[in-house]
Amino acid sequence: MADDLVDGLTRAGLPGAKATARYVHTSPTKARRVVDLVRGRSASEALDILRFAPQAASTDVYKVVASAVANAENNHNLDPATLWIGAAYVDEGPTLKRIRPRAQGRAYRIRKRTSHITVVVESREPVSTGAGARTTRRAR
């Protein structure tokens, strides 16, 4: 997924920006669980969700989303209010192997996993909830 952003444009042809955190000391499985919460949402809503998410990986994902928003604002002059999470994924980084002493002289191998977190934000028009929005529920 290295071609997510080319010349400031996403795959969909929308202007955007990208941020990556590499070698984060979080398991990719746990980080993916947090990234799935915010994929496809507006950037401000994603930051609010991550701020109050109970998972430990949410702080790392929060920093990457905030960095992507700052990159879009400073490098491409995009309005932060129109930014959405276009692509967000977690790749597996190198695994650090450690030894844990166990009973009777044995030793277990401990795998400390790392991950690379990537977030691409794109600028879209804000969705309006005007008169065309349906607010009543259908009777059963």
Curated annotation (Swiss-Prot):
InterPro entries cross-referenced by the UniProt entry: Ribosomal_uL22, Ribosomal_uL22_bac/chlpt-type, Ribosomal_uL22_bac/org-type, Ribosomal_uL22_CS, Ribosomal_uL22_sf
One MF term in the entry's GO annotations: structural constituent of ribosome
PROSITE patterns: RIBOSOMAL_L22
HAMAP family referenced in this protein's UniProt entry, alphabetically: Ribosomal_uL22_B (MF_01331_B)
GO cellular component, one term: cytosolic large ribosomal subunit
Gene: rplV
Top-level taxonomic group: Bacteria
Function per UniProt: This protein binds specifically to 23S rRNA; its binding is stimulated by other ribosomal proteins, e.g. L4, L17, and L20. It is important during the early stages of 50S assembly. It makes multiple contacts with different domains of the 23S rRNA in the assembled 50S subunit and ribosome. The globular domain of the protein is located near the polypeptide exit tunnel on the outside of the subunit, while an extended beta-hairpin is found that lines the wall of the exit tunnel in the center of the 70S ribosome.
Pfam assignment, any one: Ribosomal_L22
Annotated source species: Parafrankia sp. (strain EAN1pec)
Family: Belongs to the universal ribosomal protein uL22 family.
Keyword set, alphabetical order: Ribonucleoprotein, Ribosomal protein, RNA-binding, rRNA-binding
Organism classification: Bacteria, Bacillati, Actinomycetota, Actinomycetes, Frankiales
GO terms of biological process kind: translation
PANTHER family: CHLOROPLAST 50S RIBOSOMAL PROTEIN L22-RELATED, LARGE RIBOSOMAL SUBUNIT PROTEIN UL22M
Entry annotated with the keyword Ribonucleoprotein: yes
Coiled coil: none
Quaternary structure and partners: Part of the 50S ribosomal subunit.
Protein name: Large ribosomal subunit protein uL22
